[in-house]
Amino acid sequence: MLEITSHRNGEILNYKHGRETADALMIEVRGIADPQSRVTVNGLPALRCDREFRAEVPLKSRINTVTASAKDKFGERTQSIVLVWDKGSFKRYAVRIDDNCFFLTDLARQKPARLFDHFYLKGLKSLHEKYGSKFILKCFFRNDHDEAKFTLDQVPSTYRNEFEDNADWLHLAFHALAEFPDRPYQHCTEERLAHDYDMTMNELIRIAGKKACTPPTNVHWAMLPPERFHVLRERGVKILTSSGFMSNRIYVDGKVEDLKGGSCDIGFFYEQDVAHHMLAKRCFYDPDHDLFLSRSFFCFNIDTPAEIESKIRQEDAAAAATGCEMMEAVGHEQYAFPHYENYLPDYFERLETSCRVPAELGYKPVFFQDGIFGNPAWGK
């Protein structure tokens, strides 16, 4: 018998979980083993009390392996787990807006004199100027709401300099080929995902320049088989975010209902043990695929301003126990546009609440793709 019980494989730790110095994060690793066995942790003897053991372990790298070993007359058993040191962690938030294609359609057809003459981008810039917020806009290649089926190759490169001049707070990224069908990559081939990604990103880079383009932090509907993750990793993706994992939000008779019965299928096919960890702590590292996971907990085109503020403050209060110092605001572009059938007149009020409340609580705006959820302590 041997089991590390204090930490789980893939857990992300910071100064709240131990004693941090410039060189290491000192943590206490605890577990259980047969009383007669001799236990070591990373080669050093552990303190014993009946079945329990404990040992102080320094985490010195971004990714660390902790190995417990129990040896007795029947042989030796070992357990190794991977732990991440979120060095120099700080409170931070990101804003991700999915399903972007309407504003790009307008740029191509309305041809505003300046990029931020467009109301949508003007609204984002106003929030950046007010709160310092940073936005990643996940884009479709095709606009399925347009009768002529607009595609990105119709957008001129006229605004490239403006995009690049504002790349410190505004990024464009791949989301999917188009909005429909739903769950486009749930059972896709490698070739399909690679084709859609490369075609979309090539156009975005042409439109906005490399400086203003970034690898995405998820794909449309947050559904992708793990055997396809490498397609994204090979293109620089480091993080997968989703509001699912352990929470199914559905519409029934015009109302939102939360189903907590099991792991959510909108969560990249991760199993329940990961889903339960994400529900409690919101972040995780998958050592099998070298990917970080983040669970978002509200959507500003579903939740009202009051609900958004309440959820953010609740999650911030919970961080005292979980140690999680990052959060993500998530929404969708189309609800900002009056011609969309589900237009929300208070769209920018909801989005402003998503930026204002974290700022009031001391969270700094970041891009999750930079470092560990926006923490560049180990480099980008």
Task: List PLM regions with ranges.
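Active-site-adjacent pocket scaffolds in enzyme catalytic domains
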Residues: 147-151, 211-212, 221-325
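Metal-dependent polysaccharide deacetylase catalytic core of the NodB/CE4 family, i.e.
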Residues: 132-227, 248-252, 324-337
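An acidic- and aromatic-residue-enriched active-site/binding cleft used to recognize and process polar
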Residues: 98-100, 140-142, 177, 219-222, ...
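C-terminal domain-boundary segment and adjacent tail
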Residues: 239-244, 323-380
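Short, solvent-exposed loop/linker segments at the N-terminal edge
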Residues: 12-24
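Well-ordered, non-membrane alpha-helical segments in soluble/globular domains
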Residues: 111-124, 149-160, 190-202, 305-316, ...
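Active-site beta->alpha N-cap acidic-glycine motif
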Residues: 81-162, 213
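Long, low-complexity serine/threonine/glycine- and acidic-rich segments characteristic of extracellular
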Residues: 2, 6-10, 26-85
